[in-house]
């Protein structure tokens, strides 16, 4: 009985590692594509038992949003998605509470993504 539980735990742990690597691979490919389109800002919300949110935006020289990346979820099945509503908008015109009216975690991540780091 104990060896069966240990076996199940090891299989679950290996599956978690494999699926986590798959998720990171998908995110890295999407992020590389985003980085080729201009300057990139990244924002991440945190929370222990809440879905994590990652928002990345690519800006051109006129501070217009060229492309976006949005990931939200608790599990390894969260996929990178786009935010089509803000593509083409000027970064100064964005209001995260209007884009995500009922999602404070996404609002926070978008606010952080709009604050590009110099470097």
Curated annotation (Swiss-Prot):
Q: DNA-binding region located at which positions?
A: 23-29
Molecular-function GO terms, alphabetical? DNA binding
Highest taxon of the lineage: Bacteria
| Gene Ontology biological process terms in this record | phosphoenolpyruvate-dependent sugar phosphotransferase system; regulation of DNA-templated transcription
Answer yes or no on keyword Coiled coil. no
- UniProt-listed Pfam families: GutM
State the UniProt keywords alphabetically.
Answer: Activator, DNA-binding, Phosphotransferase system, Transcription, Transcription regulation
Role description:
Positive regulator for glucitol operon expression.
Protein's UniProt name: Glucitol operon activator protein
Q: Which organism is it from?
A: Escherichia coli (strain K12)
> Encoded by which gene?
gutM
